[in-house]
């Protein structure tokens, strides 16, 4: 398989992840779902670390890097928990675009904290375009009472997922020096796993984890496998191809999510949302090309 093909297949699996996950949380509690899914993802994370040959370097990681790995893992865990809560309440074609705002937040924070001002005009325009596109995709429904409160709840969780994802990226950049990226991902996933199951236990939901519907369990496992497969293919594409191109292709996962949400849940895009989606794709592509 060529690296370009691997990048496209990686984007495909990344896109279907959210749809598969939503199929697995119709009855299953989102906290329980996150914990179960993380078990599957952890296997792939360490497989990637093994393939890259970086596991042997774990003993040379500095204490400061360990601290930031743990903090980044906690932020990642919080992002995943918020994301799955949002998916359980809101539509895929609304939750995914808001979650992608993490790229905007990370870019803006990097400009302020790290002085990443190369191609500053493009970065500012790109972030503005993505923000506008996201706003267009979040269409307010004319509802009242519980339905209106539900609309606000999914948005709050989706924004939380974006903020924590951006924080995880910044923490990784600040403190994780000299740690191979795949090994760092594996270690952070361990932190996420501990955090996810700790939350399940603290909320008294361990019993629910034992009695998860088999049908939904299959979808949760499939979601984890899709994420892991996407990671492996993306790693292969980056290792054998051009990183800048792979990153651009990966951004197309949002299109896959929207298309499959239409097929699986009949989530239709209005003209306004379609324009918003196009703007998000253009904005993310611009940020990827002109770093």
Q: What is each stretch, according to the model?
A:
Residues 1-8, 104-163, 270-291:
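Juxtamembrane helix-loop boundary signature in multi-pass membrane transporters
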Residues 39-45, 98-112, 191-195, 230, ...:
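Alpha-helical transmembrane segments of compact multi-pass small-molecule transporters, enriched
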Residues 22, 84, 110-111, 173, ...:
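Small-residue-mediated transmembrane helix hinge/kink sites in multi-pass secondary transporters
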Residues 65-73, 119-131, 181-191:
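Alpha-helical transmembrane segments
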Residues 1-13, 20-69, 80-90, 139-157, ...:
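Membrane-interface interhelical linkers
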Residues 13, 20, 40, 75-76, ...:
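Hydrophobic residues within membrane-embedded alpha-helical segments of Major Facilitator Superfamily
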Residues 9, 36-37, 71, 98-101, ...:
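Hydrophobic core positions of alpha-helical segments in small-molecule transporters
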């Amino acid at each position: 398989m060529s690296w370009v093909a691997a990048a496209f297949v990686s984007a495909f699996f990344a896109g279907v992840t959210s749809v598969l996950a939503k199929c697995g949380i119709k009855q299953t509690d989102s906290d329980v779902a996150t914990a179960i899914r993380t078990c599957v993802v952890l296997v792939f994370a360490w497989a990637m670390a093994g393939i890259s040959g970086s596991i042997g370097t774990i003993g040379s990681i500095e204490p400061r890097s360990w601290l930031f790995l743990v903090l980044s893992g906690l932020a990642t865990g919080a992002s995943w928990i918020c994301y799955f809560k949002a998916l359980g309440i809101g539509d895929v074609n609304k939750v995914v675009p808001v979650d992608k705002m993490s790229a905007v937040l990370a870019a803006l924070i990097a400009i302020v904290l790290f002085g990443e001002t190369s191609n500053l005009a493009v970065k500012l325009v790109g972030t503005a375009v993505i923000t506008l596109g996201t706003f267009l995709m979040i269409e307010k429904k004319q509802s009242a009472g519980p339905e209106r409160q539900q609309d606000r709840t999914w948005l709050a969780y989706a924004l939380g997922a974006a903020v924590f994802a951006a924080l995880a990226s910044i923490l990784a950049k600040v403190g994780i020096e000299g740690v191979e990226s795949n090994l760092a991902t594996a270690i952070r996933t361990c932190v996420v796993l501990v955090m996810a199951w700790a939350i399940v236990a603290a909320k008294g939901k361990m019993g629910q984890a034992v009695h998860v519907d088999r049908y939904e369990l299959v979808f949760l496992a499939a979601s984890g496998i899709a994420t892991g497969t996407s990671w492996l293919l993306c790693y292969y594409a980056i290792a054998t191809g051009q990183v800048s191109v792979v990153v651009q292709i990966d951004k197309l996962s949002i299109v896959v999510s929207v298309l499959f949400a239409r097929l699986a849940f009949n989530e239709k895009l209005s003209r306004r949302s379609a324009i918003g989606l196009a703007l998000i794709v253009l904005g993310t592509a611009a940020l990827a090309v002109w770093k």
